[in-house]
Structure formats: C-alpha cells, structure tokens
Design a protein with these regions (language model features):
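Carbohydrate-binding surface patches
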Residues: 269-312
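Substrate-binding/active-site clefts of carbohydrate-active enzymes
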Residues: 1-38, 59, 65, 82
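C-terminal beta-strand-rich structural cap/linker in extracellular carbohydrate-active enzymes
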Residues: 325-341
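Solvent-exposed beta-hairpin/edge-strand motifs
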Residues: 311-323
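The substrate-binding groove and active-site-proximal loops of carbohydrate-active enzymes
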Residues: 7-24, 40-50, 106-113, 183-195, ...
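Aromatic/acidic polysaccharide-binding cleft in carbohydrate-active enzymes
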Residues: 138-185, 203-242
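Active-site-proximal helices and loops of the catalytic beta/alpha 8
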Residues: 30-33, 41-140, 205, 222-250, ...
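A structural motif
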Residues: 37-40, 211
Length: 341
C-alpha cells in the first residue's frame, strides 16, 4: 500500500526520513554519484517544499563530493527567505532558485500592465535576497509546470480577476474544455503572430535582468502547449519557427558579449503601466578590454509610440526591438538597450 503524492496515483510518496532511502540517493555509489558520473555540473531539486532541510543538505554533500563547484537550484514557488528554510539561507546547500516569484509579475506586467504587482516583488527580492541568489536565479521563458511561452502571451483563457483563487499565478489559464482539447489545441495564426511579438519583449527583459536567462526546451522554436501536460511535447524538429529562434539567438549573444551582466547591480529608474526602465551598472568598469559604465534598458509596454530619452552622445544602442531609428521612437510593445560609456 502506497501513499500518493498530491493524490496522483502514479506518484508515490517516499519516506524522506528513511536512512535506507537517503543512502540510496546520497550515499557512495548512489543516484547522485551516478548522475555526476555522466558529466553533469549540478542538479535541480523539484518540489523542495516537500523535502526536509536535512535531506536537501545530504544531497548537497553528495554533489560536493563529486564536484566541489557544483550548482544546486531549487524549485520553490514562494519567497524561501520568508519560509525559514536553511537550505537557501545558510548558503551551504542550495545556491539558487527557480524564480517563479518574480516571473509571475513580469508576465502580468506584459499581459495586464500591472506595474504595482511587479514593483512590489522587485522591491521584495532586492531587499531580501542575497546577491549570489539574485545572480543565479532561473528566469524562465516557461517551465514543465505551465503553459508554453507563446500560449502565455496569447491572452486566450487568461484570467487574473481580483479575488480569484488563482490570482497569484498568471500561468493558470482557464481549463474549460479538458485534457483532450488541450492536447490538440493549436493557436489561430493571427493569435500566434501577436503572441510571438509579446514573447520577444519578454525575452528582451529576461536578457538584461539579473539571473539566468533560462529557456524551456522548445520555447526557442515556438512549441505550443496549453496547460499541463500539453506543454511537455517532444521537440518539433520539422516545425521550427526560425523567427523566434533567430530572436533568442540574438538575445543570448548579448549575454555572452556583455559578461558584466552576470553580476551587475540593478536599479529601476521608471516603472509605470506603459514604461519600464532599468539599468545594469558595471561595477568592474572593464569587460573584454572595453570600458563602459552601464546598460540602460527602456521597455515600451504601452500601445503608443514612446520617444527615446535615455540615449546621449556617450551611448549607443546595442539591442532593439520594435524601434524606429529614423524617428528615434520605441514602437508599441518594443524595447531598446543602450550601452553608456
């Protein structure tokens, strides 16, 4: 007789306090040793809220035994520093988290222009999270537990009414038609096109925001999936959206070229429902033998053109999306990144 995890019949709850089980996972010759023998650099712990701090620390010790500079990222949906969890607060086991807590308001900001929610969570993160955690958070396009990125920005079935029990998570789309419908549903071409433009703006923000720009496999080529489990389709080798792929490659190239973004300080300069401006400051002043001070990112989240005000004689545009260079305006749902020397 087995207990089910969250009442899912094929998910068996294991005894986390069992010494035999702990040894099976963390002991010499155990599962973690086997994984590192395959050449991995670290692990992501799923549903850390259901594990004890002691067990997570055992897993960290097993990782450290194999690779002293291992990386452990924890899946947690809340602010772990308010949950009195030692696995993250002592810095000895988990190094960082999946950034559900901030990715939710970022998606809400783009879809619903909810600047209040975004400002609240940005303030909380910068005030309560250590820099080492902020710099290594997984800022994801989507994950295995939510609809695909392109579906999240299609605004179909998107509900966030005040007082709704799902108010906290923007990826809880309406489920009125059931799993069979979800498994075969494809976005209409016009909706897909509009959603694609929005996800590019999402990519732009994640590129310059502190943390790891994390792409859930398939999001880079436009994989669709409404809800869980439709989001877990195999990679569409013969149906690749080259436009999305090209955009993400451009964004990732920026991350590689401007290495100071990994540890740059962040300041929010403006945040309204229509406009989001932040800067990343180069503390070391040098990167690849080039001197520059910072990058300013200007996002037009509104529906009208936005004059570009932050560019001066000492700056140059290094990335743009929906930007009219002739008239020096950012078009609706566009963005510009300015390198300041």
């Amino acid at each position: 007789i087995f207990d089910y995890w969250w009442n899912i019949p094929d998910e068996v709850v294991f005894d986390k306090d069992s010494k035999e089980f702990q040894e099976y996972i963390c002991g010499v010759g155990g599962i973690i040793d086997w994984l590192f023998s395959l050449g991995i650099d670290g692990i992501r712990i799923d549903v850390a809220d259901d594990l004890t701090d002691y067990f997570i620390n055992l897993m960290a010790d097993a990782c450290r035994r194999n690779k002293p500079d291992f990386l452990m990222i924890i899946e947690v949906w809340k602010n772990p520093f308010r949950m009195n969890r030692s696995y993250i607060s002592d810095g000895k086991s988990a190094h960082s988290i999946m950034n559900y807590y901030l990715m939710a308001p970022v998606m809400d900001y783009l879809n619903l222009q909810d600047e209040v929610y975004l400002q609240e969570k940005i303030n909380e993160e910068f005030e309560e999270y250590p820099n080492d955690t902020i710099f290594t958070e997984m800022n994801f396009t989507s994950t295995h537990d939510m609809s695909r990125q392109v579906n999240l920005f299609a605004n179909e079935g998107y509900f966030r009414e005040q007082g709704d029990e799902q108010r906290e998570w923007p990826w809880n789309l309406k489920d009125e038609y059931g799993r069979q419908w979800q498994s075969t549903y494809i976005l209409p071409k016009d909706v897909y096109k509009k959603a694609k433009e929005m996800l590019k703006l999402h990519d732009f923000i994640l590129t310059f925001w502190p943390g790891i720009f994390s792409i859930f496999y398939g999001d880079e080529v436009g994989v669709q999936g409404y809800g869980n489990l439709a989001n877990r389709k195999s990679f569409p080798w013969k149906r690749i959206d080259k436009d999305i792929l090209s955009h993400k490659r451009k964004m990732l190239k920026i991350r590689r070229e401007y290495k100071f973004l990994r540890t740059a300080a962040t300041n929010v300069l403006e945040l309204t429902k229509d406009k989001f401006v932040f800067e990343r400051i180069n503390a070391n002043e040098k990167d690849d033998q080039v001197d520059y001070k910072k990058i300013i990112v200007v996002v037009n989240n509104g529906y009208t053109e936005l004059p570009l005000e932050y560019k001066n004689k000492e700056g140059r545009i290094i990335a743009s999306y929906n930007y009219n260079s002739t008239r020096n305006v950012i078009c609706s749902k566009g963005a510009v990144a300015i390198l300041i020397y």
